[in-house]
Amino acid sequence: MAAAAWSRVSQLLGRSRLQVGRPMSSGAHGEEGSARMWKALTYFVALPGVGVSMLNVYLKSHHEEHERPEFIAYPHLRIRSKPFPWGDGNHTLFHNPHVNPLPTGYEDV
């Protein structure tokens, strides 16, 4: 099996640039088939995908809010050895005050 694979690789590498380009030139003749394929992909993949995404957003907007878990100040979490280079130095770059606690606890929002 390895010998057959090696033989195939050596054949492909041994071809001239012109010979490698010939099999690919047949793709230019199927323009009608290509347009039909993209039209089918649009109708049967893209539009249903957008519909499923819209349904997901609708269902998530009607979802109940969860209560925040109680804050427990574990010593191995939220260690700040030096301040962050943005803002007040205590908030992470994508800090969300509703979800992410600071080292001292949740912010009152």
UniProtKB/Swiss-Prot annotation:
PROSITE patterns under this entry? COX6A
The keyword Transmembrane helix appears for this protein: yes
What residue intervals traverse the membrane?
35-59
Query: According to its UniProt record, what is one Pfam family this protein matches?
Result: COX6A
What InterPro entries does the record tag this protein with?
Cyt_c_oxidase_su6a (IPR001349), Cyt_c_oxidase_su6a_CS (IPR018507), Cyt_c_oxidase_su6a_sf (IPR036418)
Picking any one GO biological process from the record gives: mitochondrial electron transport, cytochrome c to oxygen
Transit peptide per record: 1-24
User: Pathway, per Swiss-Prot/TrEMBL?
Assistant: Energy metabolism; oxidative phosphorylation
> Keyword annotations for this protein?
Membrane, Mitochondrion, Mitochondrion inner membrane, Oxidoreductase, Transit peptide, Transmembrane, Transmembrane helix
Q: What is the role of this chain?
A: Component of the cytochrome c oxidase, the last enzyme in the mitochondrial electron transport chain which drives oxidative phosphorylation. The respiratory chain contains 3 multisubunit complexes succinate dehydrogenase (complex II, CII), ubiquinol-cytochrome c oxidoreductase (cytochrome b-c1 complex, complex III, CIII) and cytochrome c oxidase (complex IV, CIV), that cooperate to transfer electrons derived from NADH and succinate to molecular oxygen, creating an electrochemical gradient over the inner membrane that drives transmembrane transport and the ATP synthase.
The record's similarity note reads:
Belongs to the cytochrome c oxidase subunit 6A family.
Please report the name of this protein according to its UniProt entry: Cytochrome c oxidase subunit 6A1, mitochondrial
